[in-house]
């Protein structure tokens, strides 16, 4: 790092920050995707039950009884919320990837030896 110009060192620091942000976004995306898959499976399962089926849900540390209609409505809302969150994370990941690519190109250009013209 001693022979690297200060401006390139600063860009390398920024690149490291972007890569850390990207890792966090990817982890969040994986969690949201897992939650979304779980909610969709639960909805599929509940929709196969008769309308008068006894359904229970967890609320904190409690398990409470609910109706099929209410459970379906809550799951659909949860799925919608998770899909919005997933789309936002996808956009965030894309923006960070673009910044990483752009900064990598700048670093490579700055480190490239000047060509004789």
Curated annotation (Swiss-Prot):
InterPro entries: PFD_beta-like, PfdB, Prefoldin. Pfam families: Prefoldin_2. One of its GO terms (cellular component) is prefoldin complex. The keyword Phosphoprotein does not apply. Its main location: cytoplasm. It is found in: Cytoplasm. Gene3D superfamilies: 1.10.287.370. Keywords: Chaperone, Cytoplasm. GO terms for molecular function: protein folding chaperone; unfolded protein binding. Belongs to the prefoldin subunit beta family. PANTHER family: PREFOLDIN SUBUNIT 1, PREFOLDIN SUBUNIT 1-RELATED. Heterohexamer of two alpha and four beta subunits. Molecular chaperone capable of stabilizing a range of proteins. Seems to fulfill an ATP-independent, HSP70-like function in archaeal de novo protein folding. This is Prefoldin subunit beta.
């Amino acid at each position: 790092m001693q022979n690297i110009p200060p401006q390139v060192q600063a860009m390398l620091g920024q690149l490291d920050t972007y890569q850390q942000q990207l890792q966090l976004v990817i982890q969040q995306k994986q969690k949201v995707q897992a939650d979304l898959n779980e909610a969709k499976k639960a909805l599929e399962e509940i929709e196969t039950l008769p309308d008068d089926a006894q359904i229970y849900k967890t609320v904190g540390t409690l398990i409470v009884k609910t109706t099929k209609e209410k459970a379906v409505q809550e799951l659909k809302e949860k799925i919608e919320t998770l899909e919005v969150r997933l789309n936002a994370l996808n956009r965030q990941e894309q923006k960070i990837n673009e910044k990483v690519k752009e900064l990598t190109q700048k670093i490579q250009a700055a480190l490239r030896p000047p060509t004789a013209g």
